[in-house]
Amino acid sequence: MNPASISFVRSLRLSDYPSGSAITFHDGKFFVTGDDATTIQVLDKDLKPDTSIPISDYPEKRIPKPIKPDYEASAMMMLDGKPTLAILGSASTAARKKLLLLPMDVPMPRPVSFPTDVFITRLLAAGIREINLEGMTMIGDRVVIANRGNLAYQENHLILTTPGFWLHQDTASFAVCRPDVSAFINGFTGLSDIAYLPDRDLLFLSFSTEDTTNAYDDGTIGLSYIAWISKPAGKLSGPTCKPDGMIVLRDVSPAFNGQKIEGLCATPGPDDSVTLHLVADNDSGDTGLFELRLV
């Protein structure tokens, strides 16, 4: 499948949930993670708040920037035969080099935390000069992690590794592929999330522009984009990969003006269509949600 048209379905705001940065779908529910939030917000299939899952003991709703874990990426994985929500910190500071696991076979999972510093050190030694992990998905038996560049380091990366890499960080295999979007846009735009839909064999990538020259500071928000790669398993083995298509979200709906898309998830829709759910964090303390239909 190669999407021929993209239509805007709806948008809404989670005014009581801060800084949405990742979204994952499992068993009829959406799991939204905020980069400075103390809980995971669970939504039902109609995007209505269902419950929340605590992931931090910090007493306020938002964790201050210098100490926040900066959870920017999430993915559903099968670990030891159980569906498990994995949430990854950006690793842009020492406090952010961590990963959470939440088993989905219990009503209120207790998160288990793992450091990722050894794995991050190996990525730096392999030539990735700056780490800012922003997305994660599963393609077959591989974990794919998105690393975002910035205006001073204009490289995005897809890091391919194995489930459980956090348990054997010093030996876990990995490979790196750089997505090349130069055929679609001029200038640099940062990779903000990835989502693979096995039912359609499509990898979706979100990008956004932000006026910042490092992995820590926020900047003025520009345009956001969605790109896709069909049959990605065979296309991520080289040093670079090129999307099959890419669109600027402002052209889909004016609702995307001034929105910094941070996360996305893809689910199969009717008649071979695809439904995309996007989350936006505009550094204002709430979360934007958007729904698109691709046919």
Feature map (PLM): residue ranges:
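Sequence/structural signature of beta-propeller domains
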Residues: 1-295
